[in-house]
Amino acid sequence: MKREITEKVRYVMDELVPPAIRDSRWFMWPFFVMAYGTFAVRPFMEFKSRAYAMTAEDYRNFYASLGNSISRRRISDLNEASVRFITEQLRHTSGTSLLDVGTGNGYLLSRLSGERAWRRLAGVDVVAVTGESTHFEFHEGMLPSLPFADHEFDVVTCTHVVEHLLDVEASIKELLRITRRQLFIVLPRQRYYFYTLDEHLNFYPHIEPLLRLLQPHQVRHELRGGDWAIAITPAMQTAAP
């Protein structure tokens, strides 16, 4: 199901259904059953209460266990408006190396591969890439500790990942550490509910809490199709002659 459609479904559920009903276990149970393809949805419904006690290995194993869930069946969480934001900003950014953090099946790398003659295309995720995407180098790793050197990539993308992170502040610092010229972050504008699909832990109905973590870097952000699309130029780059 395309992101543009799921955003409409999310809007109806999160904005139009009364909160007391929307965040009740009995109301959300059938949606979890449909999303995860099983009646044994307790681990997924209780993910928020368990996540912060997880070790890195627990976290990896949880995501590896998602199997054929609705989030794994989607080609991408990105909407077209957010992809356009990235491609528009890339026209003003130099560099020939690109890393996609949380790359999944490599969808965004495929979309961006034709934007210029990249010298290096790479992706990193907590679980190995599935499917036939072999046009880029793949690394296993997870935020906030990625297996890359300081400023190793000219461009870094991190789309629909921040909402899943256990430590957002440390992860933002790590993304900036490995970025030389431009960092792109995309995440949903979504209000908090305990029972939410897609394993979300962090919610940004307003962008300001995240922007505070991006100081003193140069930031441009727009709301694109229900998602926050953010372009960050590291302070070291803006200060360069």
Q: Where are the regions that the model predicts?
A:
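Conserved acidic residues
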Residues: 96, 154, 181
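A short SAM/SAH-binding and catalytic strip from SAM-dependent methyltransferases
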Residues: 157-166
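Short, solvent-exposed loop/turn segments at secondary-structure junctions
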Residues: 192-194
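A short helix->loop->beta-strand "cap" motif at the edges of active sites that frequently abuts
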Residues: 118-119, 179-181
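Short conserved AdoMet
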Residues: 166, 179-180, 215
